[in-house]
């Protein structure tokens, strides 16, 4: 089975910014899609498609890690809010569970004329991903911030 999340984690696919943070069971990386600079992905290292299928240890690490990732993301761009969204579908098929931790600015909401899920859909529709060099720069800052926890 092809899994983009697994391929990014094991190096079969290019990951701009590289791995940002790792716990015993979870990985944090910059989003490879069009959800904006500073958007982080929090995903279990193992392939799992549903929260109900997380182990007790994976579940125990998740809350504190989402809190940390949100704090890091909030400082990467001038965010007015940080969205935390569970994504686990591609083409209507369950895929590798991952949380999108997205710092959102008032400028983005104005540019796209949307907020919340409508903003994310508008960003996907436009399809403009951040420049790899900017992702590398932001990933370095994120790594340094995770190191303070």
Name each region found by the language model:
Residues 1-149:
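HIT superfamily nucleotide-processing domains
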